[in-house]
């Protein structure tokens, strides 16, 4: 009964999101919304052009040709009209060949554009006759992601059809439509486009959100089926899913695939808006790319996330999504990101010419708040100490849901960068092991063991990977001791309904916040329950992160990580992981990780306070032959020649394990960040109160509930030391608390808010008591 009620609630939520989609848009008067097969969608207006621009935008085309900021784009397109030289044509034409657009398709697109401006019938007719035969006869040999090339070819045909519409003869319209349907049936998503997934996968890229949508709009008057099918699936599945996660201001496909996946979301935005439907997306879409802004390292690289490869010779840019989002939302921060590398790929240059806002200014991120939170369904936090070369960057993750595909099983993971990658995501997407479904990818790189998270090792646990796509298919992946593989055999959800009804929930955000100044916070806090990320081998797993901006040139930052891990069997061994590039040094309860190569000079020193020294085993694993070690097997993945010069895929990890078998264990680790030449760090003291455990470090006092449960009763502890301390007390019941020091009222009423359950105040040494 509870399960049925839960599924009913999911159905209502999804249907409500479909219903409210129209509420985001400002539809033009000649665009009406209709219900088609149970899906509400905007209908293309009875006018041409309506694809990528309307009649009111046509007069501006000549101005854009003379715009100084678009002159190079126009010159590039003129040059792109030249055919490929035979010697330059590869033997196997994959999508990259077609995306490096040249020749016929560019010529006819520019003819169609010229026709819009001049209305010269000869030009319009030439565009039509130049492309129609090729549309009918073109063949595409199977090759990597060839649907992208087929779809781009369809886009060219759609441009000619829509922009030269009044020059088309009735029989030519029929020929175009038949050719489009023929090509659509070659696409990976099929025609009707019902194959693959709408949240992740190739059907969440060009095929539906640009290619079929474009053709459907162009030919709607003569053949409404294609638009109804493509737009029907888009509004029922693609849009609903995105409007569900967009309010979090983040994306789920990692820092490489963010580029292509989000670009196509934005193509759908522009296509429908220019058609006249307005913005159908949740306005949170504007802020998705801010994640990349916050993860931008001082060396120009991006903090790793999801399926990525490394090369310091090639900084990571988000040219097209930054252009599309920046110009649409008039966002100067995004335009600044675009201008880092304004070299748009050939197949998108026409869209830069049509859509780029050349009057938009640019703005550095220097005045943005230093911490950024991404809420449900993610639960991610980024904390920085600044925007310059001395900046520390820390990432903290809960992962309320696992979207799979290019997202990893990394609930509870963290990363730290300072003058080089210190606490890293290990492994890499491609290399000597292969690609998406390589042994390295599915047994190490995508798995919890490759991240700074927690393992609970049940030697009998199995991990079904029978649904995981790609070559090198296996029914099972290695037992890494980590988080379960959601879905049936690790297959991603098709749509939002399947995601919410399935087993893709992996965590819950328990608390988050930063302050006391939101612009330059002293602390940044995130806590999550990630029990659901694991199988029944665990009863409870909670992790708290607290990042401290120490505002000290010598030791600029620290991060405290507190964990509660309860296994279903006390014999299941627990592991606290810390990954690095260079070999760590272990002395007692201290772990030192340095960057000494490739121009890097940062250092991380971790002090393990829990488990107690007598119950703590700290070891390192790594070096050639054990760099990607998974309980007896090394999943080697050497970089391709000329890539990963700094070995950012890593080679070492530290494991902290309790010596004594127990169902319940706690970890408390204090990480200080400094230059690798810094000799003196802050003393780290553990605080033990009657209901709390915590850390005294520099001028900071931080506490957590000893049991990781909410503290709702009076408690206390003592502080010894000189000067004034800044206190951050977490895990408190929201509401008013009174603070006593040495038996006297220090603060008669301090409020712990509901979102973070934390108190922040200042005080000196003494005995503190906290009352409700």
Swiss-Prot record:
Keyword ATP-binding: no
EC number(s) given by UniProt: 4.2.2.7, 4.2.2.8
Pfam families: DUF4962, Hepar_II_III_C, HepII_C
Listed Gene3D superfamilies: 2.60.40.2750, 2.70.98.70, Chondroitin AC/alginate lyase (1.50.10.100)
Subcellular location, principal: periplasm
Binding site for Zn(2+): 408, 425, 451
Compartments, record wording: Periplasm
InterPro entries named among the record's database cross-references: Chondroitin_lyas, Hepar_II_III_C, HepB, HepII_C, HepII_N
Coiled coil spans: none
Example of a GO MF term: heparin-sulfate lyase activity
Catalytic-site annotation from UniProt: 202, 257, 406
GO CC, alphabetical: periplasmic space
Keyword annotations: Glycoprotein, Lyase, Metal-binding, Periplasm, Signal, Zinc
Catalytic activity: Elimination of sulfate, appears to act on linkages between N-acetyl-D-glucosamine and uronate. Product is an unsaturated sugar; Eliminative cleavage of polysaccharides containing (1->4)-linked D-glucuronate or L-iduronate residues and (1->4)-alpha-linked 2-sulfoamino-2-deoxy-6-sulfo-D-glucose residues to give oligosaccharides with terminal 4-deoxy-alpha-D-gluc-4-enuronosyl groups at their non-reducing ends
Signal peptide: 1-25
Glycosylated position list: 134
GO biological process: heparin proteoglycan catabolic process
UniProt binding sites for N-acetyl-D-glucosamine: 96, 145, 148, 196, 205, 261, 307, 405, 429, 436-437, 470
Domain of life: Bacteria
Similarity-based family: Belongs to the polysaccharide lyase 12 family.
Quaternary assembly: Homodimer.
Purpose: Cleaves both heparin and heparan sulfate glycosaminoglycans through a beta-elimination mechanism. Cleaves heparin at alpha-D-GlcNp2S6S(1->4) alpha-L-IdoAp2S and heparan sulfate at alpha-D-GlcNp2Ac(or 2S)6OH(1->4)beta-D-GlcAp.
Protein name: Heparin and heparin-sulfate lyase
Protein source organism: Pedobacter heparinus (strain ATCC 13125 / DSM 2366 / CIP 104194 / JCM 7457 / NBRC 12017 / NCIMB 9290 / NRRL B-14731 / HIM 762-3)
Recorded name of the encoding gene: hepB
């Amino acid at each position: 009964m509870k399960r049925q009620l839960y599924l009913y609630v999911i159905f209502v939520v999804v249907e409500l999101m479909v219903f409210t989609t129209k509420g985001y848009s400002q539809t033009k008067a000649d665009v009406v919304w209709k219900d088609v097969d149970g899906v509400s969608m905007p209908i293309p207006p009875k006018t041409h052009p309506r694809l990528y621009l309307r009649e009111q935008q046509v007069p501006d085309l000549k101005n854009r040709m003379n715009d100084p900021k678009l002159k190079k784009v126009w010159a590039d397109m003129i040059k792109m009209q030249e055919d490929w030289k035979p010697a330059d044509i590869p033997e196997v034409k994959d999508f990259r060949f077609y995306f490096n657009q040249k020749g016929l398709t560019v010529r006819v697109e520019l003819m169609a554009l010229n026709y819009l401006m001049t209305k010269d019938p000869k030009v319009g007719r030439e565009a039509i006759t130049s492309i129609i035969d090729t549309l009918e006869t073109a063949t595409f040999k199977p090759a990597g992601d060839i649907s992208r090339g087929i779809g781009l070819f369809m886009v060219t045909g759609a441009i000619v059809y829509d922009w030269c519409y009044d020059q088309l003869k009735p029989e030519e319209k029929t020929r175009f439509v038949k050719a489009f349907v023929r090509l659509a049936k070659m696409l990976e998503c099929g025609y009707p486009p019902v194959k693959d997934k709408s949240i992740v996968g190739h059907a969440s890229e060009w095929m539906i959100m640009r290619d079929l949508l474009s053709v459907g709009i162009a030919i709607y008057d003569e053949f409404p089926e294609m638009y109804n099918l493509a737009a029907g699936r888009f509004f029922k599945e693609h849009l609903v899913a995105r409007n569900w996660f967009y309010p979090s201001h983040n994306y789920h496909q990692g820092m490489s695939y963010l580029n292509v996946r989000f670009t196509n979301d934005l193509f759908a935005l522009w296509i429908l808006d220019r058609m006249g439907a307005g913005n159908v997306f949740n306005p949170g879409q504007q802020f998705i790319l801010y994640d990349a802004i916050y993860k931008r390292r001082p060396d120009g690289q991006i903090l790793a996330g999801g399926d990525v490869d490394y090369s310091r010779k090639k900084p990571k840019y988000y040219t097209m999504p930054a252009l599309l989002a920046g110009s649409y939302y008039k966002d100067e921060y995004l335009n600044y990101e675009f201008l880092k590398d304004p070299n748009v790929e050939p197949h998108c240059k026409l869209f830069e010419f049509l859509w780029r806002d050349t009057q938009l200014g640019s703005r550095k991120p220097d005045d943005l708040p230093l911490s950024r939170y991404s809420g449900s369904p993610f639960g991610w936090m980024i904390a920085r100490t600044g925007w310059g070369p001395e900046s520390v960057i820390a990432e903290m993750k809960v992962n309320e849901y696992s979207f799979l595909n290019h997202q990893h099983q990394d609930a509870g993971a963290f990363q730290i960068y300072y003058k080089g990658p210190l606490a890293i995501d290990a492994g890499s997407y491609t290399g000597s092991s292969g690609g998406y479904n390589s042994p390295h990818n599915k047994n190490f790189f995508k798995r919890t063991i490759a991240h700074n998270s927690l393992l609970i090792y049940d030697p009998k646990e199995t991990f079904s990977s029978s649904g995981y796509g790609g070559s090198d298919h296996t029914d099972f992946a290695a037992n890494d001791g980590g988080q379960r593989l959601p879905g049936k055999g690790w297959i991603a959800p098709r749509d939002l309904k399947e995601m919410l009804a399935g087993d893709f929930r992996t965590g819950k955000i328990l608390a988050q916040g930063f302050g006391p100044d939101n612009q330059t916070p002293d602390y940044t806090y995130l806590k999550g329950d990630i029990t659901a990320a694991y199988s029944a081998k665990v009863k409870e797993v909670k992790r708290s992160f607290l990042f401290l901006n120490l505002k000290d040139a010598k030791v600029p930052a620290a991060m405290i990580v507190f964990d509660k891990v309860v296994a279903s069997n006390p014999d299941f061994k627990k592991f606290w992981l810390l990954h690095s590039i260079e070999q760590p040094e272990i002395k007692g309860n201290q772990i030192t990780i340095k960057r000494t190569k490739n121009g890097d000079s940062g250092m991380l020193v971790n002090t393990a306070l829990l488990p107690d020294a007598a119950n703590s085993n700290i070891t390192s694993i790594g070096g050639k032959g054990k760099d990607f070690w998974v309980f007896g097997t090394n999943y080697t993945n050497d970089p391709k020649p000329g890539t990963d010069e700094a070995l950012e895929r890593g080679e070492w990890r530290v494991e902290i394990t309790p010596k004594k078998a127990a169902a319940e264990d706690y970890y408390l680790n204090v990480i200080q960040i400094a230059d690798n030449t810094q000799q003196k760090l802050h003393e780290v003291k553990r605080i033990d109160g009657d209901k709390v455990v915590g850390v005294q470090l520099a001028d900071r006092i931080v506490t957590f509930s000893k049991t990781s449960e909410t503290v709702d009763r009076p408690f206390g502890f003592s502080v010894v030391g000189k000067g004034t301390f800044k206190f951050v007390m977490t895990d408190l019941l929201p509401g008013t608390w009174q603070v006593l020091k040495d038996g006297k009222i220090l603060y008669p009423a301090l409020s712990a808010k509901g979102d973070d359950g934390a108190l922040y105040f200042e005080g000196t040494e003494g005995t503190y008591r906290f009352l409700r």
